[in-house]
Amino acid sequence: MTKMYNVNIEAEGFDTNEAQEWVNEMGNVYADMEVSDVNVSGNKISFKAGFSGMDDTTEDDIRMKLDEYLTMHELFQPKNVSVTS
């Protein structure tokens, strides 16, 4: 079973549809990453993320991929990023 974490990003200056697509595309870029429950509202982007078939995934594992993806796809400048269980 995939262990899923809550990801919350606070940012400004992004289009809601583009932010939704940005999150979904992250699941395509990282083939083993699962993304669900995407919610974009106001200046917040939230979703659940985990790695398929891995029950030993940590918050740091998700954060590392998220930071890498943020660097590769600069749709917005995050003000605050959190990953929690």
Task: Spell out what each predicted region is.
Residues 2, 43, 64, 78-79:
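Generic cytosolic/nucleocytoplasmic N-terminal low-complexity/intrinsically disordered segments
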Residues 2-13, 45-47:
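Short glycine-/aliphatic-rich beta-strand segments at the starts of folded cytosolic domains
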Residues 10-34, 66:
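Short amphipathic alpha-helix segments
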Residues 31-67:
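Short, intrinsically disordered low-complexity segments
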Residues 32-40, 68-85:
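Conserved short beta-strand edge segments in small beta-sheet-based binding/regulatory domains
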